């Protein structure tokens, strides 16, 4: 199967046989250690990265640095983002065969001339010949204010919804995985209404989208990101209903997604908030030596013959 990882960038893993693991991670700087550790005996087959500067970073990461032994290839967008960051997907060729790759550029409502990260869409065939459609996203931040920037995230969600609906029309059983840093919570308008991502605990239909972390919204001590002492999920997996059907040829193991929160990814929060928080690389211009201000998330896919 497979394991899917997301970091503040994104990571995904396929184990030989029955499980595909998908991971979403934050930035590339933590990719080297976290996916290797998170994969256990086998590295993630797919690794999604939400924030990476350029092609050369991924080349060094996969061909020269710590991930070289895992024989990853990569796909990266060429966004016109104001901050110079892109989304990307690492994959192992013996675990998934890439059929097509494309990127979509959202038009932002707040300023048509303003740019953000492109949405990466990769279509691949896994070991049982089932088709998997993977989207890697990084929605516009809240830095300029939640209300002011909300329309931009809604625009991105509407674009994603359009692409997902197109796949629902052309595929008999669409296997869609949308992952990324959405800069919104599962129950925010952009994801709940514009994208239409529901709770996995609601009635499931093959033609709808479901948020693997929607039902975590009210839990106070879990999340991928900590802001002012409160944990929450702005990093999420959103999937098509077919992946929640245990009789499908691809399904999500245990209908669960997880946060990877090993001690090396955490350090003590300040005295005001207490507890721990993700061990980030920088605080302003000060180098801290950590991995990311987001924790990776992951889930396993069961792949049937």
Language model feature labels by segment:
Residues 114, 165-176, 184-305:
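Metal-dependent phosphoester-hydrolase catalytic domains
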Residues 46-48, 52-139:
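Structured beta-strand-rich core segments of catalytic domains in phosphoester-bond hydrolases
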Residues 1-65, 75-80, 85, 270-275, ...:
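N-terminal, active-site-proximal structural segment of metallo-dependent hydrolase catalytic domains
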Residues 1-17, 100-102, 131-141:
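Active-site-proximal beta-strand elements of phosphoester/diester hydrolases
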Residues 14-17, 24, 31-58, 90, ...:
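Active-site beta-strand/loop signature of hydrolases that rely on acidic residues for catalysis
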Residues 74-76, 120, 124-216:
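Extracytoplasmic, non-cytosolic globular domains
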Residues 13-22, 43-49, 76-77, 108-109, ...:
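Second-shell loop/turn segments in exported
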